[in-house]
């Protein structure tokens, strides 16, 4: 599984990924799937599940916060982190 940290812009996603990488957390930037984006162009920072909680703590400490936190399951379904409802 992966955490998908929704960001408001490509620049914000790149900054978020850079902060995580510097802290030793593997992170990649990708366009958000249309099924989870309520805007035309959104980006996500992808983080392995095992680093998800740590990534959120690092970002909070850096003053960065994702718009939404999603979890992409191995079967491809995407759920909101706290709600558990499928949104894909």
Language-model features: where?
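C-terminal structural segments of small proteins and small subunits
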Residues: 49-88
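Generic non-transmembrane alpha-helical segments
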Residues: 16-19, 23-25, 54-62
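Amphipathic, hydrophobic secondary-structure cores in small proteins
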Residues: 1-4, 8-11, 17, 21, ...
């Amino acid at each position: 599984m992966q955490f998908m940290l929704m960001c408001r812009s490509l620049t914000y996603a790149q900054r978020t990924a850079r902060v995580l990488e510097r802290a030793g957390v593997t992170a990649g930037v990708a366009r958000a799937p249309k099924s989870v984006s309520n805007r035309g162009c959104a980006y996500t920072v992808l983080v392995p599940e095992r680093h998800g909680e740590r990534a959120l703590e690092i970002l909070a400490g850096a003053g960065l916060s994702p718009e939404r936190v999603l979890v992409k399951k191995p079967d491809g379904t995407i759920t909101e982190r706290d709600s558990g409802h499928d949104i894909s």
